[in-house]
UniProtKB/Swiss-Prot annotation:
It comes from Escherichia coli (strain K12). Residues 15-22 are annotated as: G1. GO terms for biological process: protein phosphorylation; ribosomal small subunit assembly; ribosomal small subunit biogenesis. Residues 62-65 are annotated as: G3. The gene is era. It is a peripheral membrane protein. Changing P17R: In era1; suppresses a number of temperature-sensitive mutations affecting cell cycle. Monomer. Binds both 16S rRNA and 30S ribosomal subunits; binding is inhibited by GDP and GTP. Bind preferentially to mature 30S ribosomal subunits over immature subunits in the presence of GMP-PNP. Binds to MazG; GDP-bound Era binds more tightly to MazG than GTP-bound Era. Disruption phenotype: Lethality. In the presence of 1% protein cells grow extremely slowly and are blocked at the predivisional two-cell stage of the cell cycle. In the absence of Era and Rnc there is an additional defect in chromosome partitioning. In depletion experiments cells grow normally for 2 hours when protein levels fall. After 4 hours 16S rRNA levels decrease with a concomitant rise in the 17S precursor rRNA molecule (extra sequences at both the 5' and 3' end compared to mature 16S rRNA) and a loss of 70S ribosome assembly. This is GTPase Era. When overexpressed partially suppresses the slow growth and decreased 70S ribosome phenotype of an rsgA knockout; RsgA may be involved in 30S ribosomal subunit biogenesis. When overexpressed partially suppresses the 30S ribosomal subunit assembly defects and cold-sensitivity of an rbfA knockout; an era mutant missing residues 39-49 fully suppresses these phenotypes. Overexpression is not able to suppress a rimM disruption phenotype nor a C23U mutation in 16S rRNA. Also suppresses temperature-sensitive mutations in DNA primase. Induction: Expression increases as the growth rate increases. Encoded in the rnc-era-recO operon. Residues 154-156 are annotated as: G5. Disulfide bonds: none annotated.
Length: 301
């Protein structure tokens, strides 16, 4: 009697903030898991995305953007999380942006040179490169930086060449039993996913006005007799002015955020959702490691 082989392994997605790591993860999974927004540093937790296809299970670690400034407690912890997820993986996908190369990219590259895992270089947003003639010399420059397993020009947004990345990932998964059931997309709890969805809407509708020092706590997440969920979310900001900004004129902003978040939650949980949101000022939390621990920022460090 032959036993079918199965393959399973961990893959880290790394890169400086805002190069499209979360968008790439969502494309690889075929579902929106990691919080995506134009604002740098929006992925604060090591969300694990799981993609199972037949005998192959790829477990993705979506790291926070490694970046140079480490002044505040929250940023120190985020960089620590990003570095720790590089260590214990079969494969690393290093995402860079078009023909841009910055000191932050250099810093990530230096960390990767120290590691043992093979690295795929995903050159994202190639569809946005204005001067196509610049692309080839830039790819040659990148190729000279490190012995990459492969260099793949992609557009995470449109899906261009994402299947190529997925094929390379499959090829490098070691023979192993699957860690998760076939229908798992992420090992994070629904409560965590609810807070991520609210945070994404905050980023989307407040954009550059909103500092990173905003977080969401899910105070209540219960099933109701209608077969859905009652969810209460608490939005924590550092200053009274930020509270006014989140609430908006006559509550218009928080209403929009609530409506959009509820739609996404219903789609993700496949059930009706009753969502209530509050905004509260909790000053200085981004500099207080104890507060960060209580908010779950250091659960995986």
């Amino acid at each position: 009697m032959s036993i079918d082989k199965s393959y399973c392994g961990f893959i880290a997605i790394v890169g400086r903030p805002n190069v499209g790591k979360s968008t790439l993860l969502n494309k690889l999974l075929g579902q929106k898991i990691s919080i995506t927004s134009r604002k740098a540093q929006t992925t604060r937790h090591r969300i694990v995305g799981i993609h199972t296809e037949g005998a192959y299970q790829a477990i993705y670690v979506d790291t926070p953007g490694l970046h140079m400034e480490e002044k505040r407690a929250i940023n120190r912890l985020m960089n620590k999380a990003a570095s720790s997820s590089i260590g214990d993986v079969e494969l690393v996908i290093f995402v860079v942006e078009g023909t841009r190369w910055t000191p932050d990219d250099e810093m990530v590259l230096n960390k990767l040179r120290e590691g043992k895992a093979p690295v795929i270089l995903a050159v994202n947003k190639v569809d946005n490169v204005q001067e196509k003639a610049d692309l080839l010399p830039h790819l040659q420059f990148l190729a000279s930086q490190m012995n990459f397993l492969d260099i793949v020009p992609i557009s995470a947004e449109t899906g261009l060449n994402v299947d190529t990345i997925a094929a390379i990932v499959r090829k490098h998964l070691p023979e192993a039993t699957h860690h998760f059931p076939e229908d798992y997309i992420t090992d994070r709890s629904q409560r965590f996913m609810a807070s991520e969805i609210i945070r994404e809407k905050l980023m989307r509708f407040l954009g550059a006005e909103l500092p990173y020092s905003v977080t969401v706590e899910i105070e209540r997440f219960v099933s109701n007799e209608r077969g859905g969920y009652d969810i209460n979310g608490l939005i924590l900001v550092e200053r009274e002015g930020q509270k006014k900004m989140v609430i908006g004129n006559k509550g218009a902003k928080i209403k929009t955020i609530g409506i959009e978040a509820r739609k996404d939650m219903q789609e993700m949980f496949e059930a009706p959702v009753h969502l209530e949101l509050w905004v509260k000022v909790k000053s200085g939390w981004a500099d207080d490691e104890r507060a960060l621990r209580s908010l779950g920022y250091v659960d995986d460090l």
